[in-house]
Structures are given as C-alpha cells and as structure tokens.
C-alpha cells in the first residue's frame, strides 16, 4: 500500500503544479494524457448520511479497471484544497487518467480511491468567502465526519480491506493539512499518510502527536 500511495499522490500532486525536490524524479511525459486501447476505471458519485453534519454529503469514488465485488481492495482517501470540493481533483487535474495509465503500465495494485468534500458543514460548496471562520472550521470538523460517517459508509458499500495497513490518506494544501492531522492523530486507522504543500495544523502539535517517537 505504501508504494501505491506514493506513486499515485506524487503523480497527482505534480499535475497540480507542486514543486518536486531534486531527489524526487519528475513524472514521465504523457502521464496524464488519456490513452486509447487501455482498460478504464469507473467514477461514481455517492451520497452518505453524515450524522456529524446532519445532512447527506457527496463524495466521488474511483474503482479500478476490472473491479469485482468478489475481491477486496485497499482504499486511498484523497483530499482537496481549501478552494475546492469533491470535484476539485477532476476540475484541475486528471486523476482517473493518471490512475488508468498507471494500471496499464502495471505500476499499481488495484485499489479504490475516495474523493470526499473536506468541508464538513451543511453549506459545503466552495462559494462566497471560503476563508470565513465557519467554512474553515468545517475542515477540522471533517475529521469526525470522515471517521464516523464516510469510512463506515465506504466499508459497508464497497468490498474493501478493513485494516489500517490497507487504508491511506493524502491531500494537497488544506487537504494535506487534514491528512497529516487526521492521519497522524489516528494511526490506528491509517498506516499511510501523505501531505503536499500542506496547510497549517488544525490542532496544536502537542495534541496532534502527544507521544512522538
């Protein structure tokens, strides 16, 4: 699962213009160009009951080429930046194309990718003043929504492997901050955590990791 998350999120982050360090190789040309004659995954929109927010919330789910309900899959929860929603990665990137290409090249183990809306409030659209206190607070509230509402829904609806070793979380900007905070704060739930150009903590460091090793 570690290599899966690193390869995928690095490719997606590169697509968004995240600057790579010299020790990290650049993605090869055409990594996000749609190719003909290869198997494609499926994207669907789901709606889940959020007891945290008190409403139904939307997320996008990518299932890999050859998806079968008789198999079990690891899951990556991929979070967007502060100005986006569950559609953000598709509006400004091509995650489904990148995934399909990586599968065609034999570089990924089949997995499910969940793209949620990380702004856990009733009016969760990225409209108006996205820096308003209530909208920013929604990104911290999403931790409870993710753990108590979204993950249980995904694990009830899709054939996934229900252990920390098969559960990853990663994101860009605000989503990167959420990934670090939620992932490091819940290491019993997530074995793999990735943050890219991550926003500041939603929690104080001593609360986030009270017993650093």
Question: What is the predicted function of each stretch?
Answer:
Residues 21-213:
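Non-catalytic cap/lid and distal C-terminal segments of serine-dependent acyl enzymes
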Residues 16-20:
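Sec/Tat signal peptide C-region and signal peptidase I cleavage site
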Residues 1-5:
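Positively charged n-region of N-terminal signal peptides that target proteins for export
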Residues 7-15:
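Bacterial N-terminal signal peptides
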């Amino acid at each position: 699962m570690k290599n899966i998350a690193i390869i995928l999120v690095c490719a997606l982050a590169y697509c968004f213009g995240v600057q790579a360090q010299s020790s990290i190789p650049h993605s090869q040309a055409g990594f996000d160009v749609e190719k003909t004659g290869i198997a494609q995954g499926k994207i669907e929109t789901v709606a889940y009951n959020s007891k945290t927010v008190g409403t139904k919330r939307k997320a996008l789910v990518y299932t890999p080429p050859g998806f079968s309900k008789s198999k079990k899959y690891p899951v990556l929860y991929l979070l967007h930046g502060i100005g986006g929603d569950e559609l953000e990665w598709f509006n400004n990137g091509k995650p489904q194309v990148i995934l399909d290409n990586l599968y065609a090249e034999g570089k990924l183990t089949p997995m499910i990718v969940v793209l949620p809306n990380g702004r856990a409030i009733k009016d969760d659209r990225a409209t108006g003043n996205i820096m308003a206190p209530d909208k920013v607070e929604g990104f911290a509230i999403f931790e409870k929504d993710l753990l108590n509402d979204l993950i249980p829904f995904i694990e009830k609806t899709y054939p996934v492997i229900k252990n920390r070793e098969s559960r990853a979380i990663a994101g860009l900007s605000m989503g990167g901050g959420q990934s670090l905070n939620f992932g490091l704060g819940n290491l019993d739930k997530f074995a793999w955590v990735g943050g890219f150009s991550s926003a500041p903590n939603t929690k104080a460091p001593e609360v986030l990791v009270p017993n650093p090793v």
